[in-house]
Amino acid sequence: MEKQIYLRKSIRRYRGNDIGEAALSVLASWRGWADVYAQGADADCDIQLLGSDAKLGGMYFIKAPRYIAYWGRPTREGRINAGFILEQISLKLTELGVGTCYLGATHISGANPDERGLEPIIIMSCGNPAEPLTRTSTSEFKRKRLDKICDAELNEKMRVILESARLAPSAMNRQPWQFAIEGGRIICCVEYSGLDAFRRLSEIDMGIVMSHILLTARAQCGAAHIEHSQQDALKAPRGTGYVATIVTENL
């Protein structure tokens, strides 16, 4: 999956045929291979696979053979978990030749919380692409420079890890993340908006970017895990809120 970080792009045009059995199997078995960010009740979630006839509404809609609806807790941790899991699914589907696109302004018409209190958090379209599936170069990404999201001195491995973070997709390409480095600790922080809608989307974005960091840190260092540290929260860059710390080993 990690290699797809440097290739994936949002796909907005799809062929009419359904995704193949390999992709359907990946979606059915996601609990067996995807990492989870949240703990406890906030980790409670479901993935619902919808067809092209799904009743969807919202300001921004893409016609696709399939839609992936993430149901989770309507909390900060629940939204971070949504981005964290869905980005892994997106990268895995890209490996299989299936395109995806986050639909942050799309919702399931008439959906209500289920008996566990889970709600649709975000929807992703997916299908066989009717346009190029991947980028040919990282120069095609429209992203902030690395020194705009982290002003620390970086060794080669840490530079590779944060480059994967730099390339992460985000709602309206806002890229609301900032990072501080303490040894092998990557302190992940968010630039919050005053608007609730942007705040919620930024939390999903933080799940996406942290999935990139964790995947790449494990590829570079062999092991990495997520922690929450009050001490690290004090090191958040000015104007940001602390989210979590990704601890790398063998850096």
What are these model-derived regions, one by one?
Residues 1-251:
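Acidic, surface-exposed loops and disordered segments
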